[in-house]
C-alpha cells in the first residue's frame, strides 16, 4: 500500500528542503509542484521559465490528479508530493484530496514576503498563497473530519529530527536517518 503525502505550501517556506528530506528516503518517490504548468497555462502569469514549465508538465488537471493518486516511480511505498496552494485553481475538483495525507507547511508572513520580494519585483497576496492555504486547510478538514498536520517551518528547523520522527510516526512509517542530510544541487525530480 502506498502512503501518499501532499505537502501544501506557499513559496519561500522551505518546501524544497522538506521535499529533499523525503526524497532521500530509500522507499520514497517525490513529485514537485505537479500543478505548476497547468497554473501557468491557465493564468498566463509571467514567471521565469514559464514556457519551459508548461511544455514539460501535464496541462490537464484531471491527468495531474490521476498522477497524484497513481503508483509512484519505481513503485515506492511512500509518495511525497510538494504542492503550492496557489496552483490549485478553483476549477480543480477537490474530491480526490481525502485520498492523501494532507499536510500544511507555514512560515511567518513577513519572512515569506521579504524572501519572495527578493526574487520577484511585484508581489500580490495571490502570489503568496496564504488565502488559498487557509481555504484548502478548511476544505481538507471538512472532507476528512480530521485535523490536518500543520508544520511551522521555523519550529521545524529548530528540531528537525524530532519533527520528522513524529511525522513518520503519525503516518505509520519508520523514520530514516537519511532524511536529515542530502547532497547539494539540482535533481532530476525538480519540477
Segment roles from a protein language model:
Residues 45-49, 166, 190-191:
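Short, surface-exposed amphipathic charged segments that create phosphate/polyanion-binding patches used
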Residues 38-40, 112, 185:
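Generic structural signal for helix capping and beta-alpha/helix-loop junctions
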Residues 1-5, 178-191:
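PAPS-dependent sulfotransferases, especially Golgi type II membrane carbohydrate sulfotransferases
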Residues 67-91:
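Glycine-rich phosphate-binding loop used to anchor ATP phosphates in small-molecule kinases
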Residues 84-181, 189:
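PAPS-dependent sulfotransferase catalytic domain
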Residues 4-6, 77-80, 147-148:
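Residue-level preference for the first positions of well-ordered beta-strands
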Residues 30-32, 80, 104:
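Hydrophobic residues in well-ordered beta-strands that form the structural core
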Residues 1-74:
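PAPS-dependent sulfotransferase catalytic core
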Amino acid at each position: 500500500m502506498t502512503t501518499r503525502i501532499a505537502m501544501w505550501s506557499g513559496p519561500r517556506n522551505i518546501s524544497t528542503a522538506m521535499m529533499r528530506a523525503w526524497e532521500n528516503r530509500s522507499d520514497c518517490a517525490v513529485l514537485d509542484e505537479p500543478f505548476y504548468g497547468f497554473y501557468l497555462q491557465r493564468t498566463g502569469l509571467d514567471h521565469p521559465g514559464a514556457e519551459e514549465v508548461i511544455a514539460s508538465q501535464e496541462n490537464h488537471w484531471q491527468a495531474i490528479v490521476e498522477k497524484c493518486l497513481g503508483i509512484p516511480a519505481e513503485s515506492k511505498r511512500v509518495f511525497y508530493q510538494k504542492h503550492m496552494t496557489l496552483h490549485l485553481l478553483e476549477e480543480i475538483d477537490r474530491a480526490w484530496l481525502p485520498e492523501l495525507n494532507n499536510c500544511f507547511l507555514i512560515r511567518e508572513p513577513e519572512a515569506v514576503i521579504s524572501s519572495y520580494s527578493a526574487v520577484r519585483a511585484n508581489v500580490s497576496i495571490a502570489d503568496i498563497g496564504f488565502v488559498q492555504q487557509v481555504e484548502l486547510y478548511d476544505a481538507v478538514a471538512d472532507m476528512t473530519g480530521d485535523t490536518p498536520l500543520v508544520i511551522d517551518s521555523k519550529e521545524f528547523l529548530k528540531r528537525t529530527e524530532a519533527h520528522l520522527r513524529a511525522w513518520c510516526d503519525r503516518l505509520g512509517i519508520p523514520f530514516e536517518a537519511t532524511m536529515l542530510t542530502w547532497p547539494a544541487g539540482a535533481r532530476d525530480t525538480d519540477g
